[in-house]
Regions:
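Short-chain dehydrogenase/reductase
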Residues: 2-97, 101-109
């Protein structure tokens, strides 16, 4: 995927403890995926989130981010349900030790 803008230089990318951690909802495809990839390029570790039927695409997104040198994890959750949002945040903090950014990118009817 070609980026519209080149990646920003990151002084944090070599120290995992200093890297910002971002959750991007709806990030298995489309705009959400583009946001997640850009955050990884800019030095963030990323939690890929979408609904359970999109798990395979989420795992592909994680592999793409890891290939860029960032850390990533896929966590399924329905962000319309408060209990699942809490579980999503808890999973991010458990995996990376903190949470700095939440970017909502999902659609619904």
């Amino acid at each position: 995927m070609a980026l519209a803008h080149p990646p920003l230089p990151s002084l944090l990318s070599h120290n995992a403890q200093l890297r910002p951690v971002a959750i991007v909802t709806g990030s298995s495809q489309g705009i959400g995926l583009a946001i997640a990839l850009r955050l990884a390029d800019d030095g963030c570790d990323v939690v890929i989130n979408d609904l359970p039927p999109k798990l395979r695409a989420m795992e592909d997104a994680v592999q793409c981010i890891v290939s860029k040198g960032a850390r990533a994890v896929a966590v399924t959750a329905d962000v319309s349900r408060e209990d699942e949002v809490k579980r999503l945040v808890e999973a991010a903090v458990e995996k990376f030790g903190k949470l700095d950014i939440v970017r909502l990118s999902f659609s619904g009817c």
